[in-house]
Every structure is written in structure tokens, then in C-alpha cells.
Amino acid sequence: MRMMKNNNNETVMVIGIDHGYGNMKTATRCFPSGVARYDKEPIFQNNLLVYNGVYYQIGEEHKEFCAEKTQDEDYYVLTLAAIAKELDGKGMNRAKVHIAAGLPLTWVATQKEDFQKYLLQNEIVDFTFHNKEYHVEFAGADIYPQGFAAAFYRLQDFKGINMLVDIGNGTMNIMYINNSRPLEKKCFTEKYGTHQCVLAVRESLLKELGTVVDDLVIEQVIRTGTADIGEKYLAVIRKAARDYTKEIFHKLREREYNPELMRLYVVGGGGCMIQNFGEYDKSRVTIVRDICATAKGYEAMTVRKIQRNGGMLI
């Protein structure tokens, strides 16, 4: 979160938010993209958000993949939670907020306007999160291409031909950046993220061992390469993850990836799959492990935009 004066001399808080299918990320926070709605006050209130008289448990249940993030209220409620977490980190509960967010590369052109309207559906919002009251006024919202934002800070490193791949929970975004310039005509979005890997692993476990393993265990193995479970289960999970990672590289080759002719930059939560289970030349592949990199990029781009329009950091 960055505090700025805009060209109207108003104090605004620029907050970058990465609306992932697995996790919501800001520049400093990460939490599961789950929302459970209750009409009555629930018993457990660890992550309770109250908005418009409705109770929401944040981080509960799994957010299913949806081609349009505006199709229900979940991402709006998650946005309020993300804003609250950033404000709370600075000891604040009232602010005028300018959101910096994004969409998958090939969705930006068709969905940008609708997502912007969705995020700005209310000029002023009052809600409660973690038993703390918040008052938020919205100053604006900018929508950027997902993936590219994570590379914003290091564009100077992209000399020659480069492929950038952002592996999220629900999608994999591919972009070419040549001599620090993104190529708009060479941007692709595949429905091939870490959640699909979890599904593939789950199927392998059921087929080979006749066992259902909790997704939390599978996700831990994908993220770290291991877990405190029996070796036979670990072996099946690792093999399925390796097979899935091979398929990722196959899809990259379908988009003309050649490790001898270009460098590969991997961002997003799925980078751990490449690191733990991929076969690649480490001198030609860079894995950015900062899961908040995209949110930081969104934030930086909006800061630059406001500065160009006469605003300043304070």
C-alpha cells in the first residue's frame, strides 16, 4: 500500500490486489480465496467479515474457477478483506482507496471495463472485519494484464527474447517480452494451473492406491516437494506432479518455447511446481518465488500513472 496525493490534492491509498483463484494477494498479505456466506452470525469468527448485514467467513471453502470474476459477489467481498488487511497493517480503518488489479492476459481487452465497474460498484463502503469497523471511499480502479505486472520491476533484465509464464491456481498466462518490450500479439491464457495439477494427482491416487488424500497434503507436496505421509503415497503424488510439470513444458513448446533461443521467467504460485518437479536448465530459467510480485507490480504501475498525472508519493 502506498500513500499518495493525487492531482486533486486528495490523499489516496494505492492498494495492489491480485485476485487469484487459490489466493488473494496484496503487496504484503496472502490469504485463501474462499468465501462462505451466512445469514446468521456463525459460531467460529476467526476471519469474519460483515457487510450489508451478511456474514462472510474469509478463507473458507474453495473458490471454483470462473471465466468471469464478476459473476458473483465473492471477489468483491474478498477485495474488502484485502483492503482491510492492508489498512490494518498501517493501523488505519478509514481511507480513500485507489485499487490496482488485473486480469489474465487474453481477458483484459474484453473484461477490463466490467471488472472495473464491479470493483467500483459502491463509492463508499462500511463493513466490519475481525471485529474492527472500516470506512472506505473509492477513488478509482486500474486493471492491468496479469503476469506482466510481476515483471514490471525487472523489465531491464529482459534482454533479447524472453518468455514469461505466470502459473496461477486456475490459469497459466504466457507472454513474450523481447528487449524489455511485451508483445501484445504473443499473449496466451491456458486453463492449466496448480488446481488442475491437484486434480490430476487426486485421480492418480484413486487409480493406483484406491485412496482419497486431502488436498492440503497434495498442495503441500506440490509446494515443498514433500509431506509427512507414507512413502507409497508420496511416490504417487511426486510422479503425478512430475508428469503434470512435463505437460506444462509441452504447452510452452506449443507456444514456440525453445530453451536454447530464449530465457524463461516463471512467476506465480505455480513456480514451485517447476522448481520441485521440472527438468530444466537452471541457467536459462528464472523462477520468481515472491507470490506477491504481481500485486506489487499492479501497485507500482498505478503509482507511476498517478505521478504522471501530477500526483506524488507522501
Which residue stretches match the model-derived regions?
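Nucleotide/phosphate-binding catalytic cleft detector across ATP-hydrolyzing
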Residues: 1-164, 181-196, 208, 216-314
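Conserved blade-register residue in beta-propeller folds
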Residues: 26, 174-176
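Ser/Thr-glycine-rich phosphate-binding loops at phosphate-binding pockets of nucleotides
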Residues: 167-173
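Acidic, metal/cofactor-coordinating or nucleic-acid-engaging core segments within structured domains
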Residues: 202-208
